[in-house]
């Protein structure tokens, strides 16, 4: 077993060797290096063929028409293109948008920008389990609502929203529905022939593909129109100009092909790893699981260890690559806005650690990690006067601290 151990698969995944191999064939002079937009020679034709093959592979994972897949630089760009693109195109119909308080920053900050442009946004509170329900959305709908954006799988707590039910509601009202699915490809079944979803964002690097490439699904039936945010040569049917990065695109296609092939078996394996980890730490007192225990992907275990500071726990776990709730918006030491939205108090939000497991995680790594977590939590609590007070039966929430 090699140290340190990577348990931060929701931040990024390593590229699968099968993906790296395919990518390497699109770079050198004796490889498939041409510009897919070069129509006058075989180098361009070959590159275009590879790009279209990858488009099919991405579409196949989510059961879409390849013509509905638009290449972007990643899920952040896909979210921007979908939300700004649709809001601007349909602004004459209304200027009200709906999203949730626990979306990824790529959605929240895009919404904030649209607010500055004169749109109105309703931000929904999730349930304490971290879910957004169709009833919440229905209650927030207005005559001038044109777009709702709700994520499929949450990046911090791994909860899975019922996008099928939300889609049915919104389609019946004629309101556009965008879903950020960066965290769900290869983990949750997605069938866009059945789902009433108008736009869906994808990322390669959360699914064992390269960074810097993503895609946006834009429905053809019913036809969804969006305004481009990137202008130039008119690539991707005018929705996203810029020379296509063949090696990145081929990598994303292969990653999604592998995901489709391996998903069922991989989910079973990762569920077993996650359960194995939890069984070894659940004896710890004052341990809280953040997010629904049932409506979540097995890859994510977000735990709060009360009376332990998340940052100090991360430092104590120097051989484990994990992230703390407060590090999800990395630069700030604010407690996680996702956990705060679930109603967790600052102390619990600050004591959270996100463990995310993946394709290359082993049982040996899980056992080592669980042992280290138990040791570190026990040691840090032994140093904590608050833990002593809790053990003595003092209700810490009732204490009035003197101001300094």
Swiss-Prot record:
Its main location: cytoplasm. Pyridoxal 5'-phosphate binds at residues 75-76, 155, 183, 203-205, 243. One of its GO terms (cellular component) is L-cysteine desulfurase complex. [2Fe-2S] cluster binds at residue 328. Pathway: Cofactor biosynthesis; iron-sulfur cluster biosynthesis. It comes from Pseudomonas fluorescens (strain Pf0-1). SUPFAM superfamilies: PLP-dependent transferases. Master enzyme that delivers sulfur to a number of partners involved in Fe-S cluster assembly, tRNA modification or cofactor biosynthesis. Catalyzes the removal of elemental sulfur atoms from cysteine to produce alanine. Functions as a sulfur delivery protein for Fe-S cluster synthesis onto IscU, an Fe-S scaffold assembly protein, as well as other S acceptor proteins. Belongs to the class-V pyridoxal-phosphate-dependent aminotransferase family. NifS/IscS subfamily. It comes from the Bacteria. Coiled coil: none annotated. The active site is at residue 328. Homodimer. Forms a heterotetramer with IscU, interacts with other sulfur acceptors. Its EC number is 2.8.1.7. Its cofactor is pyridoxal 5'-phosphate. One of its GO terms (biological process) is [2Fe-2S] cluster assembly. One of its GO terms (molecular function) is metal ion binding. This is Cysteine desulfurase IscS. Keywords: 2Fe-2S, Cytoplasm, Iron, Iron-sulfur, Metal-binding, Pyridoxal phosphate, Transferase.
